[in-house]
Each structure stands twice: as structure tokens, then as C-alpha cells.
Amino acid sequence: MPTMNRSRRLALLCLGAPLLLAACASVAPSRGFDAGEGSASRHYTGRFSANYVRYGRDEGVQGSFRWEEQGRNVRLDLLSPLGQTLAVVTATPSGATLDLPNKPPRNAPEVDSLLEEALGFALPVAGMRDWLHGRPAPGRPAKSTRDTEGRLATLAQDGWSVRYVAWQEVPSASQAPAPRPRRIDLEREGGPTPLAVKLVIDPEEAP
């Protein structure tokens, strides 16, 4: 029995070694935003999980995220459950950059395909700019439903099905509390492989 336990531990270490090595490696600082001065900024933190198919096998990953936006510019940090950086995404209207540990930055017009190629799953960063605020992205076709309180309940846009599972009230120093998404479930429609992502957003503090 001790031999079996040692074998199982060794197998788990071997399976997890690439992720741990990548997480412990350094990531180059992200490119600066190209927003003009005075652009409003917001910050979100929370947890994510993704279930996807890669090389014909079911895979899953979870961790935490940090989201910073300034105008239409976004920086997204994906962290392992131990807090090490897995990837840093910087997206601006002029393009996107993906930084991975110990690898040169990768640039593209949009980052979703870069993420999927590098990590096995994509996050719809362009849509999340608005979906995290509980609204459809402007200027693009969308179908939506609302709950009895007028909040967004479901949304179909950019090839993704978005479901608002829970909301939270965000305190304000000068106004009534505003509703903000607490949990969002996303599922890609018609992609090359199944992909489902869950986001749980930490409560915001009063300004």
C-alpha cells in the first residue's frame, strides 16, 4: 500500500509540474494603456473556472482573476489557486497582447484565439468589457432577457451564451446601491470544441 501511495503522489506531481513551473516563472510587465488622461477606471477581482476539451480530452482549470479597465482598455491577470500568475492579457482598441511566463509577448488584433492556443481555453475579453457591467456590448447584435427587477438575465452575443446567475448591490457614497453581477456563467456557442466558463466576482467596496 505505501508503494501505491508513493506512485500516486509521483503521478500527480508529474501531471501538475508544467502548470506549477509556468505559474512560478516570471511574467513581463504588461504594455501600458493607450487611453487618454481622465478615462474612468474600474477594478474587479474574483474567481474563475473553465471546462473545455483539448486534444479530445475533457479538461478543467480554476483560479482567480484581476480585471482592470480604463475606458475601452483592459488588463486581465489570470492566477493559479496558489496565487502565481498564469497569464496577463492587455487589450486596447489598437490590439491585444498576451504575456506568458518565460515566453516572449504575443500580439494579435484580438486575444481570444491566443488564449485558447496557449492555455486551452478562451475568455471573451472584448465582450466582458460590457458583460461585467451587466449590459450587452454596444454596436453588435444581441438577444437578451431580463428578470423581474429589470436586470439582465440571459444574453446571446458574439457567439457566447451568457447567464447572470446572481447579482449584488454595490454601495455608493452618494447614491443608492447599484446592482452589479455577482456570478456569470458563459458558454461558447458553435465553437470548434465545447467551452464553459464561470466567473464569481468579489463584492465591491464603497468608494
Curated annotation (Swiss-Prot):
Residues anchoring lipid (S-diacylglycerol cysteine): 24
Location(s) in or outside the cell: Cell outer membrane
Alphabetically ordered keywords of this record: Cell outer membrane, Chaperone, Lipoprotein, Membrane, Palmitate, Protein transport, Signal, Transport
Xref: InterPro entries: LolA/LolB/LppX, OM_lipoprot_LolB
Record's keyword annotation contains Nucleotide-binding: no
GO cellular component: cell outer membrane
Residues covalently joined to lipid (N-palmitoyl cysteine): 24
Chain segments carrying region Disordered: 171-207
A single GO BP: protein transport
Topology relative to the membrane: Lipid-anchor
Pfam families documented for this protein: LolB
SUPFAM superfamilies registered for this protein in UniProt: Prokaryotic lipoproteins and lipoprotein localization factors (SSF89392)
Keyword Signal: yes
Annotated signal peptide: 1-23
Subunit structure: Monomer.
UniProt record similarity statement: Belongs to the LolB family.
Function: Plays a critical role in the incorporation of lipoproteins in the outer membrane after they are released by the LolA protein.
Database matches in HAMAP family: LolB
Protein known as: Outer-membrane lipoprotein LolB
Annotated organism of origin: Cupriavidus pinatubonensis (strain JMP 134 / LMG 1197) (Cupriavidus necator (strain JMP 134))
